[in-house]
């Protein structure tokens, strides 16, 4: 009880409560009938004043309460009710104690806030009393659960923040209870969780700086001063005001909350339970078989300001039950947030919905924390979920009926019911053949069907007679009507500033089609979403629709975090080492069998041991427990066992990681383990047991598919049977998981479980430690650093920042000018190695390196850089003394006569030439004198020799290693576009694109023009896959039966019909399994692109599903190599599930898989273009490495989140240096002739390479106003709409317009719309190439640096790295689309070179 401000509190209601009541009568006060001044009950107040308005009469009855003429000094206040679980607030005067119940309206807000503080105290007390060893996270979750549903809080996240913010208050209240506690009871004051809560509260108050009022912490008093009542009155009042401010912020947070679903109707018709009981099992209780965890413990509480932004997670093995543990149906819960819901009954489920695409249907439910996609229910709950699925299938059947009807208005409610009666019994939507039974089922389950149809984007379906008729029938059946909560509108000042408001999405003629898949792909993705299995595929919804056409675009992020130091490549690691829990139990441990040999330390090796009666073998798997409570036990593969010199029996093993702990996450098979390179040595006595474990090895090839499918089916059935019998899991391992390399690799079987004392992981670690050392040899003429040997005379790279003169200030950064000022590596030659007697301060080595600097043309001037070759360097007499850590690698400097005269391919070799001398003292540049002795690099690779001029004097181009077409990989390019990916791969000398599939006619024509020997199929890839399967079925049925392909293709009726229409000649040219070596392509990425406004549309969702078709091609043909390209956000789209399932699918096929993110601008193009890639290679092939980025480019380094705090970066960021400078706008387009806005003349004069005519140097025509704006934009770097003069102009039609765009002038919330109507900088880079350039579009910086026009098609093509000889097809819009959708050929070339290296390694 708190007697004075600052003193400890006591229990006010205890076993002596009756005595206290006799001593001091307690009365209930009611402040509802008199006006009072604003009251604040806090530690500051000791008296309460009330305005005297009414006097207590003698005839007032005590039980009705009294109204006071005056109210004396308040001595103290108290919180009681801890035993009852409901707080009671008391205030005391000298005369009596008062139970505070209903406050006045004016005081209600303040009192409610204080009452919630008291509730939090009671709930924390209750939870700690029953479970004092709980964790802070579990305590917060329990309190949030108990306090959820109160009107003052908008979500669980707000409750959690409130409880934490009141941590010190709660601690003080509960610590006061210790005075009356018994000796055997746990003291609150020492409770570690309560102390942690208090400490968290202090951290929040310390950081509470976003309000106008802040307490001066220098004046906070000590606890002794508080006990003496010495706290300053103003300080108390300041604390109170700060708390009020916090309360108001919670109020604002609550008011901003908006519903996710806009209600098309005013009412939600609730299902009548009695009507649907017939379709469900008999009532039963939920049986808990496994430990359950509160979602608030697993995930951080969120505010749910907009439920559309909630994360989406997947639930498996789930059940739905009420507070009485009775199983209930989802139909009892509303599909919309409603006002009349019994929140206590419904618990945390706010709403549920049905989401459907062209392939699958999902059932989702929402809590405050997340959306949950419902996977397979528990075995007990499955009968309760089946009616929901059946109703959904009926809904899809009705939707198909409506869409197939020419005029929906003709199809009445009765007509639909009659058609449902006429369905076959084997139809998934079959109910009965009796009209009465069908109508009853449709009406009583009508809310699901009604919601399913009204969510359809087709307005005709929403208003069709069946929908209105069904709603009417449901109301006539006396279902309950709930009022739907209205969607709260966010405050919007002024006019709508959305640039795309009022602009309807453009309509494409493309039709959506359900993906054609193989059964393996259908099973993997179907099991994850757990609605339809391979044996029960989703029925076709389909009818033709018009869909939104969207762009693949990725805008440069101006707010990316700037790194200040150079970071390492590969993986950012979390602390993954876990302490193994030892065993104190005595057990018998002995070796079995003979000694197999000795370790390198002379310790005897054994192949088998008995530990507590359990046999352990080399090559088996064991379980180890960790000290962290709640952590899953670890599984280790036994490499060898030995007895140490101190007679301890030990084993050395490698970690076998569960799939869920890898990048696969929830997409992994729970039985599959992955070998890793994490190893340890542990005593046998600490082993907790063994597991059933198999190293799974299978032959590779399409011809083994039937055998593997049958084996997998039996394996899954056996696993389900063991799971049902609660038997231990039987694990298997097929791959090595290496997060450091970002992939899954074939197992090193020749090095595994030999029992010889050798561990490949230990060897890798030793090599890495050796590489990290810097050593000087005895002769002091060479040294080793990062695994590279350097000698006197070598040409090397040096990090730019080590030279003081290169640390100049960069120009101001503007959009697409972020590369300006970035420096490439400095080329140097080692002259001498200087031995130091002792390391200098700040150096870690005892020697330094003397180097000669070679200058680059860009060190002289920008003009010199543009006019010179990017591989040219200048000799100088400048020398420097550098520490060895400044050296970044080796390069070569050659004579100019040994270099090619011109290049067609991007630079992938560290080679330079020098024939000029630069004097840095006066900036003079001259021919290199013959008397200067320069030892050039020796030519080791014949391909780098300069091609001799022919008799006509024309120069030949540098060509990569020529590989005969017959020895190249026979390639199928899917989603081929105009052929950028195929072009680069072919130029690398590794690929021969024999087949290509492209849906759009103009892009397909462009592909044919540039790849005349390729067979191009202009059709939907789903149809082509179906045809390939049919062709083999008709011509080689025996082969298909042998390979298990007879029923392997799952496709829609539409795809099957279109497959029959393909020309027979083209059908005969389709490849067969075994003929395709390499599949490459970039599935449509509209649904993944983060700047796609319409990514939730039907067309975009369908395009996302093309991943399934693409993977099915790989499964059907089983090529040696597979390459997937997509936008960067592919790895994070849909919470990463799509990316995880893609990798899981390839692993299930037996492939090795590697993934990474690359910046195309670092490979020789003049634009930022971040792309995700997934390589897959057959188990007996070598996975390609990622190509080294060669050009400076300002990017932060892109990392893929793995698991357990790990992040993987495929390559190192080049913002701090690279072998070559970035490619500028001037490099890319500076030599093109000037043209006018709207230029349409296709052919121009001779340009680059051996071209005699320049094509496609044409640009879009702007309207009159935009052309005027373009002319008014200054021709200076970074100029955009903000530089326009504020004036009006008369247009030719007589209309007067303001030159400054009105919307942009008011758009303060969009970073000023930087770059719109922007002019490019000669020294910067071009914007990301998109399919539709507009000055007011998503990428608005599209004006030529010197000319008043939008950049041309050819200029865009050059920014992508296409040569001038490359042709495009169609109109100007088609050509822009082809360029914008293409993979940059230089990046494809770099990937192809690495694939070529992998093939070379495979053949060694």
Curated annotation (Swiss-Prot):
Domain BAH: where? Answer: 614-748, 788-929
Give Gene Ontology CC terms: nucleus
| Keywords noted in UniProt | Chromatin regulator, DNA-binding, Isopeptide bond, Methyltransferase, Nucleus, Repeat, S-adenosyl-L-methionine, Transferase, Ubl conjugation
Chain positions of cross-link Glycyl lysine isopeptide (Lys-Gly) (interchain with G-Cter in ubiquitin): 486
Q: Which SMART domains match?
A: BAH
Q: What happens when the gene is disrupted?
A: Endosperm development arrested.
Give me the gene this protein comes from.
MET3
Query: By what name is this protein known?
Result: DNA (cytosine-5)-methyltransferase 3
